[in-house]
Amino acid sequence: MFNIQSSIKKCLPDVLAVLLFVVLAFAYFFPADIEGRILYRHDASAGRGAGQEGIEYLERTGERTRWTNALFCGMPTYQMAPSYHSTNVLAQAANAYHLWLPENVWYVFAYLLGFYILLRAFDFRQQLAALGSIIWAFSTYFLIIIAAGHIWKVWALAYLPPLIAGIVLAFRGKYLWGLLLTAVFTAFEINANHVQMTYDYLFVIFFLILAWLVDAIRKHELARFGKAVAVCAVGAAIGVCINLSNLYHTWQYSQESMRGKSELVKENSENQTNSGLERDYITQWSYGIGETWTLMIPNAKGGASMPLSLNETAMAKANPDYTSIYQQLGQYWGEQPGTSGPVYVGAFVVMLFILGLFIVKGPVKWALLAATILSIMLSWGKNFMGLTDFFIDYVPMYAKFRTVASILVIAEFTIPLLAMLALRELFTVYSSSSCDPAVASGKAERKDYTKGSEGLAGKSPVNRQL
């Protein structure tokens, strides 16, 4: 009985955090939840229209059609609405993970819960983990893509933090949990069917594993490193195998699309790629170099592409005689053709990230810094063509994806993560000085009173101090 009570008491803060996330998710979509309003999402509406023929067929026959005449004089439906018998159980498991919450609500809930799992894998206390989850989930881009209807992208981004949590646990020596989380969330991630987001986050995973490898070499702990890599590889393989049907048909379809090899090649054309999209198309949505300031100043380039007349703050100071002119002026003046809003992480979060570069110890910091810098430079696209051309020509699959600005999702992940590591370090120092006068006077080594530094920061052979 004592053990049961002890377990309940131990899990209670995590349960309360999950309940908090449910409340926050419902609160954010309060009008839609309570008043019955519908969030108009352009891409989702367009997708519904394109798939209407298949929906009617399903309602009429009870079976899914694998072909539609509604697009391009006919095309397979498995890239419009992928559904395979082999992943039916996976879909049910994902619904359980979302607690069967309503649409829109579970998107935000999955954001919050996913990053919470990641921070708990880094051995954060529940309160700090919940705070970090809120900071990450309410980054502007993640909410903008919900409004735009980029739902598969939402799913993919929500599953990536817990996927990385599985890798972190494996490198902490918790192999069973690492295997389980890596397998489950790799399966969820691939089933989300947004290959570009998955591909982008492979850079984060690459830098983390590289940093841990260097650390393992320095400390002569390659055996433990190899075991962790093997666990992650097995988990990833399980997730991939569950989705083999989807992956195979995606690959097969890509060969016949504009992402495949072109049959007609212009001679001496610098715009062509060996196998993939054309350079102009890849870099059409490139973040401006100066536009990078939006990570901490949201309206550095004016905000979203909308008429200035809709900006209530600006109109409060404007001359009403020129309203017709304001209706024709867009408030966004950046380098992209248009945008629904800036990629904003938060000035305070960026400050903590910079502070973390100085006060956080260990290899994870360098991995997060490298991934951040790379994602920012790649997001510049046509404004930094030297690096972009190199990746298009030499990095496998990079030429398959467009809208290079979207790779800033990496920075939106790494900046809050390092910021939270820095915040934990600050709380550690504060708690140590408050609890131990010897530490405050500098006469003793500080201890960690935040219960955040055990695990990766403590006994892990790969990363003893973050």
What is the predicted function of each stretch?
Residues 1, 201-239, 250, 423-433, ...:
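Perimembrane helix-loop-helix junctions
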Residues 1-30, 227-236, 351-354, 364:
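Start-transfer (signal-anchor) and selected internal transmembrane alpha helices
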Residues 10-12, 217-230, 313-327, 352-382, ...:
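Membrane-interface helix-loop-helix junctions at transmembrane boundaries of multi-pass membrane enzymes
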Residues 14-22, 224-251, 266-270, 374, ...:
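Hydrophobic alpha-helical membrane-interfacial segments at the cytosolic entry of transmembrane helices
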Residues 24-118, 134-157, 273, 277-345, ...:
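Membrane-interface coil-to-helix junctions
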Residues 34-47, 250-266:
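Alpha-helical transmembrane signal-anchor/signal-peptide segments
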Residues 113, 117, 162-169, 205-215, ...:
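Transmembrane alpha-helices and membrane-interface helical segments
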Residues 114-121, 127-216, 228-250:
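Membrane-embedded helix bundles of polyisoprenyl
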